[in-house]
């Protein structure tokens, strides 16, 4: 069954303030760090992230990431998949994903 793509703004329209607001939350940053580490950029199910929050809160966080232009969501009706917008992010903000990869799993940059 083909899903309906829910996409954020075009690469040239990505706003640094919106991106920083999206990445300010530790749960969203954790999702982005996991996605950035997977160089295959394959689609992942929203439930594949080990987030200690409710489904409703997860839905909110994925929407914030999508609206900031960091991920695409694919709506299959009874589930959603997400995919990192690596090319768009690297085009607009080169090095941002590398910075995310430098963050340790505990949520702070290594010293």
Segments (PLM) and residue ranges:
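Juxtamembrane helix-loop transition sites at the ends of transmembrane segments
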Residues: 45, 57, 102-104
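Conserved acidic functional residues
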Residues: 25, 61, 94
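Canonical helix-turn-helix DNA-binding module
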Residues: 47-68
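Amphipathic alpha-helical dimerization/coiled-coil segments
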Residues: 1-17, 33-38, 75, 85-111
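A short, conserved structural fragment
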Residues: 66-76
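N-terminal helix-turn-helix DNA-binding core of bacterial DNA-binding proteins
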Residues: 18-22, 26-54, 76-88
């Amino acid at each position: 069954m083909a899903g309906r793509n829910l996409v954020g703004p075009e690469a040239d329209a990505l706003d640094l303030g919106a991106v920083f607001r999206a990445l300010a939350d530790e749960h969203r940053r954790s999702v982005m760090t996991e996605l950035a580490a997977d160089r295959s950029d394959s689609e992942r199910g929203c439930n594949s992230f080990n987030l200690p929050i409710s489904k409703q809160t997860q839905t909110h966080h994925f929407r914030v990431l999508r609206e900031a232009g960091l991920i695409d969501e694919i709506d299959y009706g009874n589930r959603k998949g997400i995919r990192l917008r690596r090319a768009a992010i690297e085009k607009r903000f080169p090095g941002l994903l590398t910075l995310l990869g430098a963050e340790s799993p505990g949520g702070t940059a290594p010293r």
